Amino acid sequence: MLTDDRSTRGAPQGMELEPYPPVQIQSNDLTVLMSDRAKIYGGMKYYAHDGNKSHKRFWVENWTNTDESFEWAVVAPQDGRYHVDLLIAGAPGVKIEIAGPNNKLICALQENGWDKLAAPGELELRKGTNRVTVKALQAASLKLKSLELINSADKEKIDKRIQAFRSDTKWMANAGYGLMFQWGGWGYPQHGPKKPWPKMIDDFNVESFADMCAETGAGYVVWSATWMTYYFPAPIKAIADILPGRNCSRDLIGELADALNKRGMKLILYYHLGRWWAKDGVSQHGWAKNGLSQDDQNLFVDSFCSITTEVGMRYGKKLAGWLIDDGMIYYPAPLEQMGKALKAGNAERLISHSSYVMPRFTEFQDYFFGEGNEKGNYGAGPKGGDGIIAIGPAKGLQGFACFILDGPDWGIYEAETKINPPQFTRDQITALVNNALERKLALSFNLLMYEDGSVSPESLEMMKYVRTIVRGK
């Protein structure tokens, strides 16, 4: 969640949003120029969805005129040529100019909305401090998240590292569909008060839950280790070192993995940083040890890697994947390093980082987060595909979707919550599932579940209907 406390505003002509230092070019790695760390010329505004009450880091918008521009000071260790990607939103055909001290690159937007757009050619930078600018060459409605620069001398090596990092996603492509549950210490029973932490974890019936999942024919289960609060249902020491009392003695994750694996289902862990201040009651001082800062992420990365490495080593091949939410909290970050931590104990583990409505934040991941992706295929292409998204903001990743089947939200975190009926008719479910099957996209149906492990009978019946479509029985 966004640690910046600025309100949404435009910057006066020629005025910096903040006196940010020059950006240092990273050797053999990605260098990111953030739009909210640029000098802004014009009436552009920083967008914050919730008025900066959270810690999400969004983008700069209200970019409409050719006389508006972004400017960064970039320090290069030597003369070089750079490949440039833009994380940008607009309309197809709109032309953008990226200028350095020696040359300019002109690129035309390809997608309607957000995209990760590779600029043609290479941007030349001189040794020392360079002025890099971005502007539109025609009036349009545009948004900018960032520019990503890679030294062309390093690009082949980085591409090889990406190729070596990626895991085989065939099992996910062939799984057809799975279940997702945002269930944890934030939950409530159908009626009455919730249990204190970790009583709901201690009382959870793993075998009954796994039997229910098996009835649906699901190929995998996405289980939320954290979400509305940060209480982890396993004895992870790295978490206790940062936030004492936020883990527990029962290894619910390990038991779930064993029970699901025994029934032919894989386990994917959904992980959220848990910075929901109003709900969780964790002070910013308490989380300061986790180091969530937009401009110095070393402490955060160390904490993230120590936690995910311990989890990964503990469960090994039992843990098939990670679904890491709210990438807007930590992008830009050393996602290659974080990815290696996420794959600790199982090099074939699949990982995904959420980029909200924006394009992929890193190539060091395996599948598309796909939040709310129940209506489209996000560039997966025509029927008969292999599941890999061919074009657009998630290009190169395995197609994946997670969406609410019933609701009213992703999980139950308030007393007396009533589960809605499934939001789809059987005809709609049939069309949705067949579209995904024909393109090998993995569909993840999110069901609400009460504290005792019970779900809506209507939702369960709908999932059994999905089983008949996909499994034929």
Sequence positions of predicted segments:
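Mature catalytic domains of secreted/periplasmic carbohydrate-active enzymes
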Residues: L2-K473
